[in-house]
Amino acid sequence: MENNKKENNKKENNLKILEETIKEVEKQFGKGSIFKLNSNNNQSIETISTGSMSLDIALGIGGYPKGRIIEIFGPESSGKTTLTLHAIAEAQKLGGNVAFIDAEHALDPKYAQAIGVNIDELVLSQPDSGEKALDIATSLIKSGSISLLVIDSVAALTPESELMGEMKDINVGLQARMMGKAMRIQSGIISKTNTVVIYINQLREKVGNFYGNPEVTTGGKALKFFCSLRLDIRRTAEKIKNNNDEIIGVKSNIKIVKSKVSTPFKTATVDIIYGKGISKIGEILDLAIDLNLIKRNGAWYNYKNENFAQGKENAKIFLQNNLEIYNFLEEQIRKKYKI
């Protein structure tokens, strides 16, 4: 009995010490830098919606955290730029100023508009070198006037010496050093200006790799270290078809591979419609089924014990034409997940 009491007292004492240590760490490194996995304290973090309700829910905090660096990476045509354009539209809805550093020189204004981006208000820069791109990014962050900054992409941030044609050994790892310097400068400023900074990145194959993951993101290790969120987006094999059996889009999985602000390793699945972006109606439909607000029996969709559509595309059309039901479902989903 005496041993049990001693053991219990020791546990209680250790818990108190742990709680005090967590508070000290949060004071030093900021809220969200350390937490218990089942803790809901991270709900207080300020966010900008990702534009995908499924991803907002998976992130656990309702969107991208303000004052943090985020990396979105994945294979070619997986939906990286689409995802960031949705975030831009959401930031603009909140009245924020948004900047897009287009190092790839590939931004499609018509597609951005179709997603909901106000291109008249979007600040755009198309620099011709990596150093210029990162200097412009740092200046915009320092100004404190930008709520969201997107850099597309890390792979296109080419150092000036490479552009000048100097292919010497001294240039090996130059991009990684350039990114490392930028991260050290930007990370401190971002937390003070409360800017959300999104770096889009690409995947490359490791040369001579025989074990483990053969894929690696470009730009060295600094971005991985400094970012608070890393999202891996990939297309699935599933295609989205309309009622005429024509392919109109793809499904993509977004995996949270790193999170300093919530529980990582969750996945969100989104429907990306060609020319339109993420299908919000499709998301509401899927989430409503998860919460049993809508039932599915085979190909039939049922709401309040009545079949209303056969097939997912018809169910989406029904919700599009019945906004009262759509709005009710969205409200219930937001209440459930507190977003």
Swiss-Prot record:
Keywords tagged on the record: ATP-binding, Cytoplasm, DNA damage, DNA recombination, DNA repair, DNA-binding, Nucleotide-binding, SOS response
Listed PROSITE patterns: RECA_2, RECA_3
GO biological process: DNA recombination; DNA repair; SOS response
Residues bound to ATP: G74, P75, E76, S77, S78, G79, K80, T81
Subcellular location: Cytoplasm
InterPro entries: AAA+_ATPase, DNA_recomb/repair_RecA, P-loop_NTPase, RecA-like_C, RecA-like_N, RecA_ATP-bd, RecA_C_sf, RecA_monomer-monomer_interface
Pfam families: RecA (PF00154), RecA_C (PF21096)
Gene Ontology molecular function terms on file: ATP binding; ATP hydrolysis activity; ATP-dependent DNA damage sensor activity; damaged DNA binding; single-stranded DNA binding
Entry GO CC: cytosol
Disulfide linkage: none
Superkingdom of this protein's organism: Bacteria
Predominant location: cytoplasm
Function: Can catalyze the hydrolysis of ATP in the presence of single-stranded DNA, the ATP-dependent uptake of single-stranded DNA by duplex DNA, and the ATP-dependent hybridization of homologous single-stranded DNAs. It interacts with LexA causing its activation and leading to its autocatalytic cleavage.
Family: Belongs to the RecA family.
Name of this protein: Protein RecA
Species annotation: Phytoplasma mali (strain AT)
